[in-house]
């Protein structure tokens, strides 16, 4: 190629700005797509805003803009163009700051580019790269939407990455199995889309075709060089992968920029529309207008969830659990079992589901044997939780059509014995006719579950691999390593800690399966048959030949008129996870019970694809009349915004009532949401379970939910309660609700207004740990223990002390104030309810467990 470059200052200035603009937009799209992931989401957002602000600083002559805004304009079109441009730029920043939805965040970029372009045009400055960048960014976001909604495309890209990286590895004598995130294919795709758009917008395509193909080849050469480099690196943490992504970015950037600089990109040709002379007939005949409409409808269809109505809205959904030949138990937390084994496994799941109005059935071989092994032994200390109050237990040696006749969802968990052929036929006929199947498994063939599970799942081509799916980020576990595909099951998942996956198997699926949860920065750690004592687990390290990146942790698919969901890990559904994950589980059950089928989904997808193809045909063939290109990203974003406003109405929020306890996490409370640490609240959760309560972590202060609960717990909130929230709390207690507030003097500021309302105060007199014991702590273990206590002052005519001690004077550490049918319990220790003081997997304090039990009994008398 002939790379003669004019070296005059003007050209260098324009070329430098051209390169800078393209580079900053490429970086922005990669940031928002999580191709350069940052641990802190806020930091990612700030970085994106800084990149866009840099674009404004380098491109906008601020003085000239102010001058144009102040002066009277003879050319009103230029003035309106300037105003519209400024509005779009501001609107793009509003989008960036107001949502966490990746698609909306991405859609802000073409709006920003269009706004910047219009602003410059309003002051008679032309930047031809903005037309290219607007077209490119919109094309990329449309591609991203297709990957998210038509997951066969995701599978194709994932498999191409694995095959390509394996091929390069075999050529250099290295074994590599890399998903597109680790291999960098997602970054490569962004550059490919930019190059393709540049070619489409270039004039003299016959001349440009050679340059275009050379650029594509060099992008792939850059990718190959990158793969060779990383083949010699031992990956342990996510940062090991991330730190090298910038190398690939540069390798792809150089040939792309050279190609674009030498390409003759066409400038946008727009006929100014005079609003006063709008002709409806001309608009109808304008192909660009129809392209705009088709893009809007296609985007709306792709991003919206239709066909999600309950299949039996007037009847209870019936769920059958297969309770035999399985690894695991149906135990529930009970007194007498503490520490690591206290939680049990799956016994609380049907109890939670029953509280949400679902009817549960458990299928076992022998009812008597099952109850003798599962039902907790009655002790004087505990309120007896009868499992049969929440689930109907039926007896049968095999699964039959009659048993499944009235069932909506059939749940199979960790089976270690294959179903008989006639049972498998019954199950799949049940699904084919509209029933739903939920299959839960675990890692490395633990307990011999892999073959029976894979045997069951053959008709849908999903299988459990002999591995452990591990996150690459050891500090944050899976929280920074997930990717959720756009679908109704995960749509309401606001925080990744709701998923609660721990260590399970990765799934091998067909291209028809929907990858619900992807371990984007995950590792498929192959099992070791020699490690029988530790469930065949591998070495918890990356070894060459193991898949790195984009492993599937959970998948869904359609079969006939029915639906199937498969989880490679059971942790989400276990007792200890339910307070965090139940909202997510509720969405799973809702989707399985919905009317959406393969036919309705295929119809919705097919129509949207036809509309999108029609858009492309009109854009590239109808050139007589154009409309401003800025309208296309606006239409796209409008369609996305409408769908994201409508979708929550199509997916019901979690419904649960009864003995529900909400633990607030919406006021920056001082406890750790990560389970089983010193600062976690799992010990509190276990003791609530033992007393028949169903605790749930509440991430938003939702009055409609709280009013249906029995107890609302705030543990050292650091964000102040609002006046409306305090008024609601007062009404909640008047109607019988109980508030438990644990806060010491250092944290009381956020709760001060609530305390004052009930004549309560916490004095600045540090009492420290109580009782203070240096030797023989076992002598005091049946007494309550405080970590950092402070004295409470209260009106003895309104409240009463639940716990106090005397040291010259009386110090009250727990006070209850009655309000209507309920009341407020104040604990003057921010750490009293934490695991380190109540119960952890390694230790527990009997005195606090007994005191919590007495408090629960006291609350029961209030109800009576």
Regions found by a protein language model. Give the residues of each.
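Coil-to-alpha-helix initiation sites in intrinsically disordered, low-complexity, charged segments
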Residues: 1-2, 163, 583, 597
């Amino acid at each position: 190629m002939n790379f003669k470059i004019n070296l005059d200052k003007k050209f260098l200035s324009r070329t430098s700005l051209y390169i800078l603009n393209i580079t900053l937009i490429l970086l922005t799209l990669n940031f928002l797509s999580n191709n350069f992931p940052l641990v802190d989401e806020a930091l990612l957002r700030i970085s994106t805003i800084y990149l866009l602000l840099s674009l404004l600083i380098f491109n906008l002559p601020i003085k000239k803009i102010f001058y144009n805004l102040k002066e009277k304009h003879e050319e009103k079109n230029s003035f309106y163009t300037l105003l519209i441009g400024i509005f779009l730029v501001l609107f793009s920043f509003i989008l960036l700051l107001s949502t966490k939805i990746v698609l909306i965040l991405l859609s802000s970029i073409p709006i920003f580019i269009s706004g910047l372009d219009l602003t410059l045009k309003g002051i008679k400055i032309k930047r031809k790269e903005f037309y290219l960048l607007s077209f490119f960014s919109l094309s990329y976001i449309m591609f991203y939407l297709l990957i998210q909604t038509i997951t066969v495309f995701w599978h194709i890209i994932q498999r191409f990455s694995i095959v390509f990286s394996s091929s390069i590895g075999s050529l250099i004598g290295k074994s590599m199995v890399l998903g597109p995130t680790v291999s960098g294919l997602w970054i490569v795709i962004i550059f490919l889309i930019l190059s393709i758009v540049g070619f489409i917008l270039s004039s003299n395509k016959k001349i440009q075709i050679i340059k275009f193909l050379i650029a594509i080849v060099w992008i792939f050469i850059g990718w190959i060089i990158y793969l060779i480099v990383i083949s010699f690196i031992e990956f342990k943490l996510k940062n090991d992968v991330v730190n090298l992504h910038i190398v690939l970015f540069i390798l792809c950037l150089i040939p792309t920029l050279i190609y674009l600089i030498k390409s003759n990109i066409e400038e946008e040709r727009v006929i100014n529309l005079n609003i006063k002379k709008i002709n409806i007939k001309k608009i109808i005949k304008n192909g660009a207008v129809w392209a705009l409409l088709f893009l809007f409808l296609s985007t709306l269809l792709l991003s919206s969830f239709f066909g999600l109505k309950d299949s039996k809205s007037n009847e209870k959904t019936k769920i059958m659990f297969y309770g035999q030949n399985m690894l695991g138990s149906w135990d529930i937390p009970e007194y007498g079992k503490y520490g690591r084994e206290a939680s049990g496994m799956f016994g609380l799941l049907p109890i939670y589901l029953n509280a949400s109005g679902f009817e549960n059935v458990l299928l076992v071989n022998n009812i008597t044997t099952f109850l003798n092994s599962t039902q907790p032994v009655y002790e004087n200390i505990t309120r007896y939780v009868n499992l049969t109050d929440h689930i109907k237990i039926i007896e049968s040696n095999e699964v039959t059509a009659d048993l499944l006749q009235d069932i909506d969802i059939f749940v199979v968990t960790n089976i270690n014995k294959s179903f008989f052929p006639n049972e498998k036929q019954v199950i799949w006929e049940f699904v084919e006719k509209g029933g739903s199947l939920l299959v839960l498994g675990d890692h490395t063939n633990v307990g011999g579950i892999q073959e029976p599970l894979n045997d069951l799942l053959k008709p849908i081509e999903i299988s459990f691999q002999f591995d452990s799916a591990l996150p690459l980020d050891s500090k944050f576990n899976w929280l920074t390593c997930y990717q959720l595909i756009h679908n109704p099951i995960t749509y309401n998942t606001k925080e990744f800690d709701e998923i609660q996956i721990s260590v399970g198997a990765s799934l091998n699926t067909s291209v028809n399966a929907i990858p619900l949860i992807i371990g984007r920065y995950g590792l498929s750690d192959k099992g070791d048959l020699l490690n029988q004592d530790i469930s065949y687990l591998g070495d918890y390290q990356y070894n060459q030949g193991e898949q790195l990146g984009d492993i599937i942790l959970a998948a869904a698919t359609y079969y006939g008129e029915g639906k199937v969901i498969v989880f490679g890990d059971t942790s989400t559904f276990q007792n200890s996870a339910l307070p965090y994950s139940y909202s997510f589980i509720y969405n799973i059950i809702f989707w399985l019970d919905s009317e959406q089928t393969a036919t309705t989904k295929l119809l919705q997808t097919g129509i949207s694809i036809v509309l999108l193809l029609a858009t492309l045909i009109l854009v590239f063939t109808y050139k007589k009349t154009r409309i401003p290109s800025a309208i296309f990203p606006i239409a796209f974003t409008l369609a996305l915004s409408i769908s994201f406003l409508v979708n929550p109405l199509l997916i019901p929020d979690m419904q649960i009532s009864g003995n529900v306890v909400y633990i607030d996490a919406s006021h920056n409370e001082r406890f750790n949401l990560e389970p089983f640490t010193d600062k976690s609240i799992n010990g509190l959760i276990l003791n609530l379970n033992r007393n028949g309560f169903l605790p749930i972590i509440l991430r938003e202060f939702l009055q409609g939910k709280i009013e249906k609960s029995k107890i609302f717990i705030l543990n050292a909130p650091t964000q102040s309660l609002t006046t409306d929230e305090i008024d609601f709390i007062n009404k909640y207690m008047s109607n019988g609700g109980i508030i438990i507030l644990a806060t010491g003097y250092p944290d009381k500021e956020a709760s001060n207004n609530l305390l004052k309302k009930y004549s309560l105060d916490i004095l600045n007199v540090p009492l420290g740990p109580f009782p203070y014991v240096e030797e023989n702590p076992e002598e005091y273990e049946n007494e309550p223990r405080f970590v950092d206590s402070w004295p409470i002052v209260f009106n003895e005519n309104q409240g009463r002390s639940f716990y106090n001690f005397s040291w010259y004077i009386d110090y009250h550490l727990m006070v209850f104030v009655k309000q209507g049918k309920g009341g407020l319990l104040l604990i003057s220790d921010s750490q009293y309810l934490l695991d380190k003081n109540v119960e952890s997997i390694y230790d527990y304090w009997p005195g606090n467990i007994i005191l919590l039990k007495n408090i629960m009994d006291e609350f029961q008398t209030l109800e009576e």
